[in-house]
A protein has these predicted regions:
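Small/hydrophobic positions within alpha-helical transmembrane segments
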Residues: 9, 37, 67, 71-75, ...
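Juxtamembrane intracellular "pre-TM" segments in multi-pass secondary transporters
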Residues: 118-143
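Cytoplasmic helix-loop-helix junction between adjacent transmembrane helices
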Residues: 34-70
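C-terminal ends and interior cores of transmembrane alpha-helices
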Residues: 8-25
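Helix-loop-helix hairpin linking two adjacent transmembrane segments in secondary transporters
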Residues: 59-60, 67-121
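Extracytoplasmic gate region of multi-pass secondary transporters
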Residues: 136-172
């Protein structure tokens, strides 16, 4: 259910991105709400995909996990290329349509995940931590803060690299 919810949130955020900015007096509020929704979905996906992959029966888990983690980069390049081609063909004024087109991918994934049998990583007879136990763990809090800072750093570098490339290539 978590994987399906993550895909639904990702799709919902992208769909909201196409419509919500016009619904507010200040379009930034609509953008902020939309981005928050799809960021929650994307963040959940980033955290949940690895354990799902780990639970899949495979002869070579290391190879599969390595391939999985490389697809984040491939996906980023693919999104940039497809979006650039879309904008070249239809103009940047069609960005709302592009958001709706990108929303199709998580919708299809959500539907596909409803048919996937997922095994539990917790052994039979054992129980996982409750939410209260997890959030009161100092180790969890420390790792959560580290992941938050790492994500912020990653996004900062990503945005800087994009701005640098736009300025350097003269396409901004």
């Amino acid at each position: 259910i978590s994987m399906i919810s993550a895909h639904i949130l990702s799709a919902a955020g992208l769909i909201l991105l196409a419509f919500l900015p016009e619904a507010f007096a200040d379009p930034f509020v609509g953008l902020l709400v939309s981005v928050t929704v799809y960021a929650i979905g994307g963040g959940l996906l980033e955290v949940l995909v690895s354990p799902v992959m780990e639970s899949c029966p495979s002869d070579n888990k290391e190879k599969a996990m390595s391939l999985l983690h490389s697809f984040y980069c491939f996906g980023q390049v693919g999104v940039v290329l497809v979006s650039t081609l879309f904008f070249a063909a239809f103009g940047t004024g069609s960005w709302r349509i592009l958001a709706l087109i990108w929303a199709v991918l998580p919708i299809v994934n959500a539907v596909m995940f409803t048919k996937v049998p997922i095994g539990s990583l917790i052994a039979e007879g054992e129980r996982g931590m409750t939410a209260r136990e997890l959030f009161s763990s100092k180790t969890f809090v420390l790792l959560f803060i580290m992941m938050l800072c790492a994500g912020a750093s990653e996004q900062s570098v990503s945005q800087w690299a994009s701005a640098f490339a736009e300025k350097g290539l003269g396409i901004s």
